């Protein structure tokens, strides 16, 4: 049995056997009985390393045994392991030469929190979004076949990710190609099936045994010349499986289903994988695991321990704490909390409101709504396409759907947004969470493309609140609009604005001027408003909180263009196609000739690190905004002087 820990070690644990493993090749030299010790040392080191820097926690703890068994049986990196989503990849990184760097994970300049091809040859496919592993692994299996190689490909996918359509699309194709692909279903909350009792466990062991597999494969070859006999045997086998397992779905698709087996018994995993490794055709191994395995608090609260912050050691000397913390130290609500509170308040007023989320209840702030309004709450699992079209169908029946979705995940439902919502002018409100840079989760989770892909869609309106109160009011404004609307807001807390409980519909397409200045006008969008205001003071610049990206406040922009010599747009979005591009288009349409400076994210993927650090590196903090404006003003002055000469 693996060890269970109750505390996260604050000092590096003693891991003598793990320390000898520089690569999976070293792991494969060990006798099988030593793997249990490797498992315990790896899990303890994982607890320590994540405690040092913070990061995804429960998923990695749950696949320690599986990770060890896979690298022990498969000749990685020649054999390909594809981890779905990637939250569970930390043990994999520890075993593949990155053990001592793990304390830098998700930090600027450190390891990525997800598998990343440029980081290691063992990271065979970059991930972050869910349900892509089977497609990628199948592509690798087909590529190996075309090259005449016997390399193996394995996709490791969780039960949540298995609910997405792409996973089944890939499995259907794999069954058609009959490629040598192993899919491991890592089932850590029994959402796929719930097999109970000794009969189920008994048959699961039989189906995973070497003798049964050999008998099955040999019989298939012999009986292939006698179709009637083989059909009878196959139907008998299926009937036996169906008595004790509801997972006939995978057999019906065309996979040989094995399991379920205990994902925390490393010896059973090794034995089963050894039996499966050389089989021909698509195989599915179903393993049961516990998220947070080996750390008692995480096993008791897997949702709360999905990820953790850095563990700070307690100071030896007690520091006096003020009886009344300053306003700066008071805990500010996150934008997700503001959305969740607005959703509940709005639902109390309007019985037509329906909340929809694709498996992001906690992250999107919908827990309270799900408890208070269970009949009007739909978690559709990792099915973004379905979420959007479901909302469209509800709108057809005079309901008022609100879809809470991360900006980066709405990309998956783009066709549905155009075809099933916007084209039909259906009344659907989208709460776009994690808009802009997200920080430690990196490029896979950045919401930096939404303005570009949304503002091209007819009938769509887009709001970008600058603070907590504006977020609440713009959500209300979007909800009151009879048509598709999106409100984008960042991860985490805002500047600390007082939130008015009264909800007021703000005029669509109307900005507000926050500061009057000379020469320079800054058109700030969303979360960039506070930094723009700070930069404007030494510049004596005008600052306009634009509020809306579509429609733009044309009058305010043209007025600012007429009264200033430099127009500056600031946004936490890719420059191409973003809000600045929209302003440029408007000025071009109106034949306005003016110097315009577009400050936005550069044309490359921005990787992981603290959000404020990444914004500063992109020149989107107050100092960077001021510096770039001064550089442009100096350039204007040089051009004027050159013209005068």
Curated annotation (Swiss-Prot):
Residues binding thiamine diphosphate, per UniProt: 87, 128-130, 160-161, 188, 295, 384
Residue sites binding Mg(2+) per the record: 159, 188
GO terms, molecular function: 1-deoxy-D-xylulose-5-phosphate synthase activity; magnesium ion binding; thiamine pyrophosphate binding
This protein's name: 1-deoxy-D-xylulose-5-phosphate synthase
CDD domains found in the cross-reference section: TPP_DXS, TPP_PYR_DXS_TK_like
Gene Ontology terms: biological process: 1-deoxy-D-xylulose 5-phosphate biosynthetic process; isopentenyl diphosphate biosynthetic process, methylerythritol 4-phosphate pathway; terpenoid biosynthetic process; thiamine biosynthetic process
Species, as recorded: Alcanivorax borkumensis (strain ATCC 700651 / DSM 11573 / NCIMB 13689 / SK2)
HAMAP family linked to this entry: DXP_synth
Documented EC number(s): 2.2.1.7
Its biological purpose: Catalyzes the acyloin condensation reaction between C atoms 2 and 3 of pyruvate and glyceraldehyde 3-phosphate to yield 1-deoxy-D-xylulose-5-phosphate (DXP).
The keyword Metal-binding belongs to this UniProt entry's keyword annotation: yes
Cofactor note: Binds 1 Mg(2+) ion per subunit. Binds 1 thiamine pyrophosphate per subunit.
Cofactors demanded by this protein: Mg(2+); thiamine diphosphate
Organism taxonomic ancestry: Bacteria, Pseudomonadati, Pseudomonadota, Gammaproteobacteria, Oceanospirillales
Keywords in alphabetical order: Isoprene biosynthesis, Magnesium, Metal-binding, Thiamine biosynthesis, Thiamine pyrophosphate, Transferase
Catalytic activity: D-glyceraldehyde 3-phosphate + pyruvate + H(+) = 1-deoxy-D-xylulose 5-phosphate + CO2
Pathway the protein acts in: Metabolic intermediate biosynthesis; 1-deoxy-D-xylulose 5-phosphate biosynthesis; 1-deoxy-D-xylulose 5-phosphate from D-glyceraldehyde 3-phosphate and pyruvate: step 1/1
Family affiliation: Belongs to the transketolase family. DXPS subfamily.
Domain of life where this protein originates: Bacteria
Keyword Cell membrane: no
GO cellular component term, pick one: cytosol
Assembly description: Homodimer.
EC primary class: transferase
Pfam families: DXP_synthase_N, Transket_pyr, Transketolase_C
